[in-house]
Amino acid sequence: MEVLKQKYIQEVVPAMMKKFGYKNPMAVPKIEKIVVNIGVSEAVQNPGAIEAAARDLAIITGQRPIVRKARKSIANFHLRKGMPIGVKVTLRGERMYAFLYKLINLALPRVRDFSGVSPNSFDGRGNYSLGLKEQLVFPEIEYDKIDRIRGMDITIVTTAKTDEEAKELLALLGMPFKK
């Protein structure tokens, strides 16, 4: 069983039940899914950029990403409806816990000048979003094999009703929040 899932069952659930007064362990908030997205703006001029971003995302998450297409045309960006402009992966279950473990323990500590993630990036409904400026913080990505440095958006969707519950859940799982 994944390390974080075991930690959730053995440590997080009892701590959350005690702090928030849940009567039933099934009422304790849990992580539902993690969505990782890479926006590839240069795909308008260079269609090969999408494949490179998809390859990087597949290596990082262990799952084949879906190509996202533009919903409407925007003349200023030379963008037409239906053009590929990004790649996204939705992780659930074991892969989700494996990715979260990798993010917390391997990737975030490798970010330059890292002092913790912002505690203000919750959306008001218990979901947390963070952005990474480069994919090189993940140990699977080799510097010589990439064509250019790309950032990514990571959204952690929880079943928590409030931001306070979600923050406590992520903090107990080891997410390094700024003090």
UniProtKB/Swiss-Prot annotation:
Keywords: Ribonucleoprotein, Ribosomal protein, RNA-binding, rRNA-binding, tRNA-binding
GO annotation (BP), single: translation
Record's keyword annotation contains tRNA-binding: yes
HAMAP family linked: Ribosomal_uL5_B
Protein name: Large ribosomal subunit protein uL5
Protein family according to the UniProt entry: Belongs to the universal ribosomal protein uL5 family.
Functional summary from the UniProt entry: This is one of the proteins that bind and probably mediate the attachment of the 5S RNA into the large ribosomal subunit, where it forms part of the central protuberance. In the 70S ribosome it contacts protein S13 of the 30S subunit (bridge B1b), connecting the 2 subunits; this bridge is implicated in subunit movement. Contacts the P site tRNA; the 5S rRNA and some of its associated proteins might help stabilize positioning of ribosome-bound tRNAs.
SUPFAM superfamilies according to UniProt: RL5-like
Subunit composition and interactions: Part of the 50S ribosomal subunit; part of the 5S rRNA/L5/L18/L25 subcomplex. Contacts the 5S rRNA and the P site tRNA. Forms a bridge to the 30S subunit in the 70S ribosome.
Molecular function via GO: rRNA binding; structural constituent of ribosome; tRNA binding
Lineage: Bacteria, Pseudomonadati, Dictyoglomota, Dictyoglomia, Dictyoglomales
Gene Ontology cellular component terms for the protein in this record: ribonucleoprotein complex; ribosome
Keyword Protein transport: no
